């Protein structure tokens, strides 16, 4: 007679069963974050492809914006709703469209659809990095780094128009449409002179410089561990030792600049810190623009330039250029406002 001693198997709940299935090791990991990521990414991308292929912007902007109307990849866009809609979420079943899909597209309903699902998809992707990092016992710095692009997307596409009078003032989802929005930001907010924009540019370009320097330095200090004829065949992918010399790299940059990173942790943290902080700062600046905050208005130079025709600076020339952008864009974008600029604020003929 055999007697088995042990604990009885506990009853597994529905949550445990779902958790096991979601976090199972498979070719494409799903996880709990995937419940947010995959549906939202699918709907956002599908909405954008549908809009750029078929949907006109005639009713919202008076523009052609789809492949069907003759646009190409650079000029097609999913455009924002008209200014009359305000901040309505434009649900398909809402008061505006009343379940009519064609009318919903004409009103610009695809834009909030793509913007909101796109935002949640990006957040889902960040949570995916958190979830997988936890599973394989990694620190969560990848997810923290990805918060930079998310903060920029949310601030530009959601927070900025929420601070203005409607979704109309957000960027449309298209290449040329984004360029037009950049000109709008410059003309109405003098964005290039904003210190938060400067920090964002420093972060992005500084990160590109660091990336190029780091990649070149590692390539320059690789050990010759194998007999391969080129760099990429000279190493065993399973080797345990380092593939490049930090000491040699440190000596090189110490001679070049007089200072160099002393260890890899500080080096790679700095490469993380520069771009992410730059993106965070630029997102913060856009939140300020949503509230119509100004930065670096050198009024004394403007007054002197107005009084003395021979006095001009690059700043005063840019201010006049911004006024020209506003004078053109208001008539183009907001004809319903019937805004008339007084003569004294229009660009002078010889000023540009």
From Swiss-Prot:
Gene3D superfamilies: Photosystem II protein D1-like. InterPro entries: D1/D2 (IPR055266), Photo_II_D1/D2_sf (IPR036854), Photo_RC_L/M (IPR000484), Photo_RC_L/M_CS (IPR055265), PSII_PsbD/D2 (IPR005868). It is an enzyme of class 1 (oxidoreductase). It is found in: Plastid, Chloroplast thylakoid membrane. It catalyses: 2 a plastoquinone + 4 hnu + 2 H2O = 2 a plastoquinol + O2. Its EC number is 1.10.3.9. Chlorophyll a ChlzD2 binds at residue 117. GO terms for cellular component: chloroplast thylakoid membrane; photosystem II. It comes from the Eukaryota. Keywords: Chlorophyll, Chloroplast, Chromophore, Electron transport, Iron, Magnesium, Membrane, Metal-binding, Oxidoreductase, Photosynthesis, Photosystem II, Plastid, Thylakoid, Transmembrane, Transmembrane helix, Transport. The D1/D2 heterodimer binds P680, chlorophylls that are the primary electron donor of PSII, and subsequent electron acceptors. It shares a non-heme iron and each subunit binds pheophytin, quinone, additional chlorophylls, carotenoids and lipids. There is also a Cl(-1) ion associated with D1 and D2, which is required for oxygen evolution. The PSII complex binds additional chlorophylls, carotenoids and specific lipids. The keyword Transmembrane helix applies. Chlorophyll a PD2 binds at residue 197. One of its GO terms (molecular function) is oxidoreductase activity. GO terms for biological process: photosynthetic electron transport in photosystem II. Pheophytin a binds at residues 129, 142. A plastoquinone binds at residues 214, 261. It is a multi-pass membrane protein. Fe cation binds at residues 214, 268. HAMAP family: PSII_PsbD_D2. PSII is composed of 1 copy each of membrane proteins PsbA, PsbB, PsbC, PsbD, PsbE, PsbF, PsbH, PsbI, PsbJ, PsbK, PsbL, PsbM, PsbT, PsbY, PsbZ, Psb30/Ycf12, at least 3 peripheral proteins of the oxygen-evolving complex and a large number of cofactors. It forms dimeric complexes. Belongs to the reaction center PufL/M/PsbA/D family. 2 of the reaction center chlorophylls (ChlD1 and ChlD2) are entirely coordinated by water. Photosystem II (PSII) is a light-driven water:plastoquinone oxidoreductase that uses light energy to abstract electrons from H(2)O, generating O(2) and a proton gradient subsequently used for ATP formation. It consists of a core antenna complex that captures photons, and an electron transfer chain that converts photonic excitation into a charge separation. The D1/D2 (PsbA/PsbD) reaction center heterodimer binds P680, the primary electron donor of PSII as well as several subsequent electron acceptors. D2 is needed for assembly of a stable PSII complex. This is Photosystem II D2 protein. It comes from Bigelowiella natans. The lineage of its organism: Eukaryota, Sar, Rhizaria, Cercozoa, Chlorarachniophyceae.
